[in-house]
Structures are given as structure tokens and as C-alpha cells.
């Protein structure tokens, strides 16, 4: 994959000729090298201008938040405690609001024997803030599991100082509606004031009480609430819930409310027939989008940074399968509007730093940043057109590239995790049409599985077009 600027140009009829709306995704740390399945980017907000990168296999690295950084330090390795089978792994990382003084941070991960989701606290070394103490683990809460998917796993502190934890329904849909079960919920706990023999307390303002009910629950009715975030200026909690058959959801979370699964998927009954929602206190999603090749929302953040004025106040999120990164605009009153920004396959997570700048973790191993500006585009110099057909295809598909000027061309196929699986062209190429067939095989000649892939056209070190294709065998 190119480690340079990735560009998607979105035409604007309001701009003069030669000017286009451009959204740039670029490698935030081009001299650093790649990570292995980065699952999170977190700023400890301790005044040190550092970022912590969590890898799914259980390692956390610390780096300087500087585009010129060339090295990383291993902060913590708990890979021996973790299973990465199916959707398992190190899933969440959060720093205590008073981390600068107490050095506490929290992780969530999937473990076996017995199978469970674990929320645990660790401490950084007081004499070396770039190294954690592996022996400092304090298990806060463990959630029994039957399956290894629909885990959720995001943890984050709210402005109220409480810790929130999103949990999927473990592939057992009915658990999401059962308040005596943890699964399919957003929890809210007090880690500063333990009580009741636990390593945490329950805030007095939590909404649920009663025999057998888990008082830790803040909201419920989720399928797989993989990522959520807080928007401090508004106090809203934004949550992306991964759908089943038809719809991906963006929800605004309210105290004690039911978000519908499995009675509803998106704004429709599930399955699509009549359903009785009487007395269920259901809140419909703020926004939904149909699958049509999309299949797994990655919830993001409302952008509040200084670098992209055109994105301020917009909710930035992605679809893991299509790679589409989008901006949702909502003023709290009118229906939301959505705009595609760019494409980057295999995005599991977003992060923000102390300035509100947005980072994008990709399973290609890179950490990206996003820029959206009005930029003069010299289209005749490197303009290219990418055509693919048939799409979907069975045994082979035809790929054509048209260049209006000579360019260094890298035309490659990527899977949904962002891994390059086939190189179709990689050469200095003359102006004109260049054509190639792809037979659905990787670079070693093995036939790939049916599914969604991406053909990416790089010219002169810039990604100028990415097209989704579907192989059906």
C-alpha cells in the first residue's frame, strides 16, 4: 500500500474550474513503519504529547505525536492473556482522567478458559512513564461469553468521570433485551469508589435497579456496538452499532433507553415483518445506511480539531468492509446529511489527540490523518480513469486505466483488511490506455475466496482512485 498521500476528489459545482473539494488521508507517521493490526489510538491527555497504539494481539506501543517520529517503545505486552480467535483480542484502551498523577489505565480483552471479556486496570512505571508494570493488573470486571464474536469492547471515560464499556450480544440476539444479562449493553461504572465487594462502584444516577438487574447498565438493545465516543461540547454519546442483514446504525445514546435489537434492525422490524414494540422504550437510530456491499460500521468521533474547518462538528465514521470514510452533519434538529470523504479499506478504529485532531487506524498497519480542503488540482498532469468490468465477476474481470500524461502507475488489489493481494501494474507508463485482466488469484497463484476486494490506482505516489469489486465463485 502507498505510504504517501491518498486522495479522493469530490466534485463541487460551486467551485471554479480547476478547483475541487479534496479529502486527503495521509500517513501520520511516515518514518515510523507499520503496526500489526492496530486496534486503537489513544492520547493519555497528560500533557506529554504522546500517543498510545494498541494492537489486537495484545501489545501497546507509545510514540511521540510528531510526524517525524522514527521509533516506538513497547509500553505493555499482555498477548499471553489474550485470544485473537474470530473477533477476539485486545479491544479497548482508556486512560484515567487523572492519569498524569495516578498512572492508571484500563484495557478490555478477550480471554479463554473460561471464555470471557475482561476489563482490567494497569499502572505505568512511576519512574518511566513509557513503560507499564505488567504485574500491576487489577481485574475490574469479567463478562462470561459463549462465542468469540459480537464482543464490542470500546472503553472511554465520560466528562462525569465514569467509565463506559460497550458490549456486543455475543451472537445471541435475545440477550440484548435482557437486563439480567451483560451482553448487548453500554455499561457505566465508577472505578474511583469501589463498593459491594467489587473493584468498582455503581453511580447513583444509573437508570436500572431491581432484583437480578445489572445496575451497571446505562443503555441496551445493541447487536455489536464496536465503537462509541463522546462529543464534549454537546455532551452527546455517539455509537455505531453493526447490523445483521440490512442496516448499519449511528445512535445518539440516552440514559436508560432501548436501542431495539433484535426487535428492530435500523428503523425497521427484524425480521422485516410486523413487530410489537409496545412498552419497549425504543429509540430509533439517528442515521442508518443499507448494506449494498457495506457490512460493518466503525463508529468514530465528532471532529473538533483546528486543521479541518470544513469538518468541525461533523461525525466522522467508516465502514470496515467498503473502506468508505464519511462525515455525518446533524444540528440536533433537522435530519442528518451524509457525505463520502474518502476510501481506506480495513478501518477498525479512530482516535483523537488533545487538540481534537483525528487519527485513523488501519489494518494495513498504518496510522492515518485526515485533511479536507479546497485545493487547486492540476488534473491534466496525472489524471487517470479506472474502469472495471464485469463487476461482480466470476472467473476474471477486465481492468482498464487511461492516462492523459505519463505517470508511474501502481495498480493493485487489496482485501477488506487492507492487505495487498495482487499487483496488476507497477511501472512507468506512457499516456494512453493500459489494460489487464485479473483472474481472482493472489501473487502466488492461489485462488482467493469470494467476497469484496478493492482495486487501487496509484499514480506518481498518490492514490487517485479506489474501486470496490465483488468476486463470486
Identify the residue ranges that each predicted region occupies.
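Glycine-centered coil/turn sites that cap beta-strands in beta-rich domains
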Residues: 378-414, 423-427, 435-438, 458-459, ...
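Beta-propeller fold detector
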Residues: 28-30, 70-79, 130-142, 198-207, ...
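Conserved blade-ending motifs and adjacent loop-strand segments that build the rim/top face
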Residues: 334-354
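C-terminal tail/sorting-segment detector
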Residues: 428-431, 435-437, 443-473
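Beta-propeller domain segments
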Residues: 54, 88-90, 98, 169-337, ...
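Bacterial N-terminal signal peptides
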Residues: 6-16
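Acidic, Gly/Ser/Thr-rich repeat motifs that build Ca2+-stabilized beta-propeller blades
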Residues: 21-174, 227-230, 235-243, 293-331, ...
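Short, glycine-anchored, charge-dense loop/turn motifs used at functional sites
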Residues: 161, 414-421, 453
